[in-house]
Amino acid sequence: MATQAAGIFNSAITTAATSGVKKLHFFSTTHRPKSLSFTKTAIRAEKTDSSAAAAAAPATKEAPVGFTPPQLDPNTPSPIFAGSTGGLLRKAQVEEFYVITWNSPKEQIFEMPTGGAAIMREGPNLLKLARKEQCLALGTRLRSKYKITYQFYRVFPNGEVQYLHPKDGVYPEKANPGREGVGLNMRSIGKNVSPIEVKFTGKQSYDL
């Protein structure tokens, strides 16, 4: 991913209605050294042709059959917050930033992961944050205190949107039929081979 020159970045988000991956044309550059500012985001929806949809289709293979990743609507309003979320940092211009969305049954106050309090709107909310961990922290708070489900996405500078969490539609601590275990061995730890038998082989006892 090419690093963009330092300058003013005027963001204009464009979404493509694909099955798993959308394109957002997010950054355009104007050369002005040692100056950095963000203008109000202008958002417009854009249709994609069938060939673009076919090219994006393989990106959804990770999700189990029957689950369709939710589409990010950039027109979703943000919570009411008078402070700062810490900005998107310089990383957002050359790497990525993160967007978390949720639906609230009413207007209520919540704690921001970056500090301070904000008012979530009744209905859909969208919040841009610089780090994935901030989305996870806020999402945990939403689920534990407010009983609200959430989703978050990664947005790249070239406009691509990647759906991140929950990956298959079910939060990780819940059982989900069809979910494949990672590093799963159907045996107890006591049935692993003796570590001395695999010493100097480059393998671990749980690998056998």
Swiss-Prot record:
Report which residue ranges the record marks as coiled coil.
none
One Gene Ontology cellular component: plastoglobule
- Principal subcellular localisation of the protein: plastid
Q: Per the entry, what span does the transit peptide take up? A: 1-45
Instruction: Name one process (GO BP) from the record.
Output: photosynthesis
Which InterPro entries does the record match to this protein?
Answer: PsaD (IPR003685), PsaD_sf (IPR036579)
Q: Which domain of life is it from?
A: Eukaryota
Q: Name one GO molecular function term.
A: protein domain specific binding
**Mind telling me which Gene3D superfamilies this protein's record contains?**
Photosystem I PsaD, reaction center subunit II
Q: Where is the composition biased (Low complexity)?
A: 50-64
The protein's PTM annotation reads: Phosphorylated by a threonine specific thylakoid kinase in a light activated and redox-dependent manner.
Induction annotation: By light.
- What does the record say about its membrane topology? Peripheral membrane protein
Using the record's annotations, give every residue carrying the modification Phosphothreonine.
T48
List the cysteine pairs that form cystine: none
- Describe its partners and assembly state: Interacts with PGRL1A and PGRL1B.
**Function, as annotated:** PsaD can form complexes with ferredoxin and ferredoxin-oxidoreductase in photosystem I (PS I) reaction center. PSAD may encode the ferredoxin-docking protein.
Protein name per its UniProtKB record? Photosystem I reaction center subunit II-1, chloroplastic
Which species does this protein come from?
Arabidopsis thaliana
Gene responsible for this protein: psaD1
